[in-house]
C-alpha cells in the first residue's frame, strides 16, 4: 500500500 511508502522515511 502507498501508506507503507511513507514509512520509508
UniProtKB/Swiss-Prot annotation:
Compartments reported by the entry: Secreted
Identify the keywords attached in UniProt to this record, alphabetized: Amidation, Neuropeptide, Secreted
Q: Which GO BP terms apply?
A: neuropeptide signaling pathway
Name of the protein: CalliFMRFamide-10
Q: Which residues carry this modification: Phenylalanine amide?
A: 9
The Swiss-Prot or TrEMBL record describes its family as follows: Belongs to the FARP (FMRFamide related peptide) family.
**What organism does the record attribute this protein to?**
Calliphora vomitoria (Blue bottle fly)
Q: Main location per UniProt?
A: secreted
List the GO cellular component terms: extracellular region
Amino acid at each position: 500500500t502507498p501508506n507503507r511508502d511513507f514509512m520509508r522515511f
